[in-house]
């Protein structure tokens, strides 16, 4: 009985960490934190059936019925931004593998609206 009560209490917090749009913010030495459209677009391609990159907001958005989990999105921004590296996406949707990029620090942002 107690476990069920605890689950009912925690469930809203778990559900609150889902979003319809996310982006990556990055920092490099000598600069400020910026919204990184290249990294965001690159990560957005990881889920092609469930997401699309919005050129106007520079955010990755979900298609109807899909959600982002904020923690997983942020992990991907950090992993690809600072460790594995990422590539810019061309306007035709292909990846330009001629220049692998990394940044000094990265984080994810998933605003509730926008």
Where are these regions (language model features)?
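Aromatic-residue detector
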Residues: 2, 42-43, 73
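Extracellular/luminal segments of secreted precursors and ectodomains of membrane proteins
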Residues: 47-48, 52-114
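Cleavable N-terminal signal peptides of Sec/SRP-targeted secreted and luminal proteins
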Residues: 2-16
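Secreted, propeptide-processed cysteine-rich mini-domains
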Residues: 12-59
